[in-house]
A protein has these predicted regions:
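Membrane-embedded beta-strand positions of outer-membrane beta-barrel proteins
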Residues: 166-170, 259, 306, 381, ...
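Flexible, surface-exposed loop regions and adjacent strand-edge segments
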Residues: 183-190, 275-281, 321-333, 411-423, ...
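Flexible loop and strand-edge segments within Gram-negative outer membrane beta-barrel domains
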Residues: 177-179, 223-262, 266-270, 281-358, ...
Length: 468
């Protein structure tokens, strides 16, 4: 017997701390008996061939974070993910399942919500009933080439027959970097710069003399000899996130329903000057989700199931976010030396030099703002009519689905002047102060309609069963 050892590495960029108002314990779940919606049918997990992993929605329900699928990291064998920056509103991850089988750039598994391809990044975990991963060709074969890199199936919650049940959940959490890099201060930077200079040219005159190094160390004149920890000045130690959810479910023999609403707010990752503007320049965001489904039974033979999800999300960022240095804001925090220039000059002007003309205070507070908004609706209707009166086990089933989203992007930018303190006490200016303007906006609309109809037959013969 061959044994294979799979080593998985998971990189976590943030720690989250949540204090639930009311603790709830989930009942044990037999994953093999759970039903998953495949391409054209519902089937118990134990009857799905191939490499399959199952996780209940209750296991990730109380895991903080705006992207709930990130909570799957370390919980399902063979699944890994990475995030390019983790900033609020930009924390969508890329997922990878073991055994990628494509040479194209897109090697991510497809994601289906209730059997329909959709965006799961902002799906609220309280609406998730279960998640199933199909990880090999045998399991994902029915999806053809689209399933070459695996399939993530998400089943959302449905109403249950009985009295009305109302549930409300609220949480407040804080995220923080697991570890911040420790950088050289101005004094250490000067020492090592001189050492590197002498290594290259032993006869060279050091750039930083003893008096300058001592001024950096003592902090005697922070405007002439700056020692700015850009990371501590502009990157928050803790980032606040709040989430509220309410859901209502119930029903009887003729109708079963489930309705939920969720609101998520992320305060932003940077320290901004709230007195500098009347508008928000932080990388904050909020998401509002509404989800509802109804199952109607018209007599013994006709069943209708409708589902609709609506989402409204908004992301905010500095105006320079649309420019190169805006996108590389974190990189600039980590690449600007402590002694490059002070944040502000002694006269209150924004500091800068000929070598460093991207003052982080100016980028965050005086470059304008940008707003990205998306409104989306995803809906479908399933109709099933039982033909058992004529052929036992035969039914006709159909589905029609509609997806639409509208993106609206607004960018209002302005420029700011920076001033460098010269040796004679004067200032040299770089750039100009401008008024905020309408530098760009666009609107994008996407619509998709899909439908299918077919016959289905199910039957049992002795110890055999047929479902086609």
């Amino acid at each position: 017997m061959r044994k294979h050892l799979l080593l998985c590495g998971v990189s976590v960029v943030s720690f989250f701390y949540a204090l639930p108002i009311r603790g709830q314990e989930a009942e044990p779940v037999d994953s093999l008996e759970q039903t998953v919606q495949l391409l054209y049918e519902n089937k118990p997990v134990k009857y799905v061939n191939g490499a399959v992993s199952y996780i209940s929605g209750a296991e990730i329900e109380n895991v903080p974070g705006s992207n709930r699928l990130n909570a799957l990291a370390g919980r399902i064998p063979g699944l890994s993910f990475y995030n390019i920056d983790g900033l609020p509103g930009f924390e969508n991850s890329t997922y990878r399942l073991r055994g990628e089988h494509t040479f194209s750039d897109n090697r991510a598994p497809i994601i289906l919500i209730d059997g329909k391809m959709d965006d799961a990044s902002s799906l609220d975990s309280y609406d998730i009933e279960s998640i199933v991963l199909l990880k090999d060709a045998a399991a994902a074969g029915m999806y053809g080439l689209r399933g070459a890199n695996g399939v993530i199936l998400i089943n959302t919650k449905r109403g249950k027959e009985g009295k009305i049940k109302v549930s409300f959940n609220t949480e407040t959490s804080f995220s923080q970097p697991t570890r911040k890099p420790k950088y050289l201060d101005a004094y250490q930077y000067g020492l090592l710069y001189n050492e590197a200079q002498l290594n290259d040219n032993p006869g060279a005159t050091p750039k930083y003399d003893a008096a300058t190094l001592e001024a950096y160390r003592s902090g005697v004149n922070p405007y002439k000899y700056p020692n700015v920890n850009w990371q501590d000045e502009f990157l928050k130690n803790n980032n606040l996130m709040t989430r509220n959810n309410i859901n209502i479910s119930g029903g009887g023999e003729t109708a079963i329903y489930y309705v939920s609403a969720n609101y998520l707010y992320n305060s932003g990752a940077f320290n901004v000057d709230r007195n500098a503007n009347t508008y928000n320049t932080n990388t904050s965001g909020n998401v509002m989700n509404v989800h509802g489904n109804v199952q109607l039974n018209f007599g013994k033979y006709l069943k209708v199931n409708t589902d609709i999800r609506a989402k409204r999300e908004k992301r905010n960022a500095p105006g320079a976010w649309s420019d190169d240095y805006g996108k590389d804001l974190l990189t600039n925090i980590y690449s600007t030396p402590f002694n490059a220039h002070p944040i502000m000059n002694e006269d209150g002007s924004i500091a800068g030099t000929s070598d460093y003309q991207k003052n982080l205070y100016g980028v965050l507070n005086h470059s304008g703002y940008s707003i990205w908004e998306r409104s989306s609706i995803s809906s479908y209707i399933d109709i099933a009519y039982d033909l058992s009166r004529w052929v036992k086990g035969l039914s006709i089933e159909g589905r029609a689905g509609f997806n639409t989203y509208t993106d609206f992007y607004t960018n209002r930018t302005k420029k700011f002047a920076m001033y460098q303190l010269m040796a004679d006490g004067s200032y040299s200016q770089f750039g100009l102060d401008t008024e905020i303007g309408n530098s760009g906006e666009y609107k994008q609309i996407y619509r998709n309609f899909d439908h299918n109809i077919g016959l289905r037959y199910t039957g049992d013969f002795d110890k055999h069963s047929v479902d086609a």
